[in-house]
């Protein structure tokens, strides 16, 4: 599901078209499709990652609003006690943002800002993105080796 603002983010921040991104997915649903499979708890999923997660979406999820498929699908994930991961990227944060994050965290939601890691000494932006994506997938129990993992040893300077 790609929101209107998600589509704008893709256009502004990536070299991909919206259609190219949709083709990467096994399934794609319109943001207004409240009848989509993911809007029902009987449709089995491992969980859900909202990336990026706006403060509007965070607030809607925290308050149980379901006027958008992303909000409804997140609500379903919560009620079914599945894994929900929110990649919030707003800064700085004010008290309402933090209260909404705390409320969701207490419900078992993983709040995971896409903060880059540098211990693996990434040489490209793609390596930074791959590492963040790998960490997000790890949260849902989906393990891919898209980037080096911390081994306890310092990486030599490239």
Predicted regions and their residues:
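A cross-family phosphate/adenosyl-ligand binding-site feature
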Residues: 1-85, 91-158
């Amino acid at each position: 599901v790609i929101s209107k603002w998600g589509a704008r983010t893709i256009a502004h921040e990536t070299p991909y078209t919206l259609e190219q991104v949709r083709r990467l997915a096994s399934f794609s649903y319109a943001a207004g499709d409240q009848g989509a499979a993911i809007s029902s708890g009987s449709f089995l999923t491992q969980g859900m990652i909202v990336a990026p997660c706006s403060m509007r979406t965070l607030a809607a999820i925290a308050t149980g609003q379901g006027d958008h498929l992303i909000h409804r699908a997140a609500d379903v994930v919560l009620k079914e006690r599945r894994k929900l991961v929110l990649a919030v990227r707003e800064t700085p944060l004010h008290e309402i943002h933090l209260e909404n994050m705390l409320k969701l965290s207490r419900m078992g939601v993983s709040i995971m800002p896409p903060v880059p890691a540098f211990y693996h000494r990434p040489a490209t932006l793609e390596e930074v993105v791959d590492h963040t994506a790998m960490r997000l997938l790890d949260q849902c129990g989906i393990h891919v080796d898209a980037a080096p993992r911390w081994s306890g040893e310092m990486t030599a300077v490239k």
